[in-house]
């Protein structure tokens, strides 16, 4: 049963957001990183992002039960009741906010709460079922994750904003490549996503271009602010792999090629974030 509640928190999704917050802190603090603060930020990040994910599961239980990709989730499968899921999401979220305020201060808590709002309220409730721009607007939750870590050590500045934009620029290609191969699911429940709103040829071009933009943006940003050989050992292979996967999907589009692109986007972002860490500590 405990495992089902953990699934509500989407650990396979939120770990990148938690890592983004840690990267924000490490990038700002450099060699002065406090290991205790890293642990506290990890706990707070897991609770707050997990709480918003659990709320998303609760709110979308109706469409999750109709989509092949999601019908085995805890609520549609009957393993967790909607009321218990809602109660769990509220309890976990409030725990995250409270610990954030006690451990990390009001500004960090404000940024974390802003990220929660963008995902749980703005994206999940207000936008997802109304416009294909849902992830474009709701994607600012990713910025908030990284910035919440940054302001633990420094005020927000141009570098922090540009660094947080890595997450924002990465999100559309990540989500829409999934939506491309799962477009029948999204059509079934009338959720507007780019691949369900434009023709297939346009979808392929837009998603591929956005993925290339995301990859190149990471490389350029690393060159501008980090530019250390040890980091390039991670960034350059990630860049090349991302370009190859994207070109293959562009030349020969299929559900499988876009599934491959989707699966590649997370490791590419991970390698960039790890490069930032090893370049700053």
UniProtKB/Swiss-Prot annotation:
Q: How does it sit in the membrane?
A: Multi-pass membrane protein
Q: Name one GO biological process term.
A: heme O biosynthetic process
Q: Which CDD domains match?
A: PT_UbiA_Cox10
Question: What is catalyzed by this enzyme?
Answer: heme b + (2E,6E)-farnesyl diphosphate + H2O = Fe(II)-heme o + diphosphate
**InterPro entries reported in the protein's UniProt record:** Protohaem_IX_farnesylTrfase, UbiA_prenyltransferase, UbiA_prenylTrfase_CS, UbiA_sf
Task: Tell whether Iron-sulfur is among the UniProt keywords.
Answer: no
**What EC identifiers does the entry list?**
2.5.1.141
Metabolic or biological pathway, per its Swiss-Prot or TrEMBL entry: Porphyrin-containing compound metabolism; heme O biosynthesis; heme O from protoheme: step 1/1
Q: Where does it live in the cell?
A: Cell membrane
Question: Which Gene Ontology terms cover its molecular function?
Answer: protoheme IX farnesyltransferase activity
Q: Which PROSITE patterns match?
A: UBIA
Q: Name one GO cellular component term.
A: plasma membrane
List UniProt keywords, sorted A-Z: Cell membrane, Heme biosynthesis, Membrane, Transferase, Transmembrane, Transmembrane helix
Report TM segments.
Answer: 13-33, 38-58, 85-105, 107-127, 132-152, 161-181, 206-226, 227-247, 261-281
Other remarks on this protein: Carbon 2 of the heme B porphyrin ring is defined according to the Fischer nomenclature.
Which family does this protein fall into? Answer: Belongs to the UbiA prenyltransferase family. Protoheme IX farnesyltransferase subfamily.
Alphabetical list of NCBIfam families matching this protein: cyoE_ctaB
What is the purpose of this protein?
Answer: Converts heme B (protoheme IX) to heme O by substitution of the vinyl group on carbon 2 of heme B porphyrin ring with a hydroxyethyl farnesyl side group.
Q: Under which name does UniProt file this protein?
A: Protoheme IX farnesyltransferase
Q: Which organism is it from?
A: Caldivirga maquilingensis (strain ATCC 700844 / DSM 13496 / JCM 10307 / IC-167)
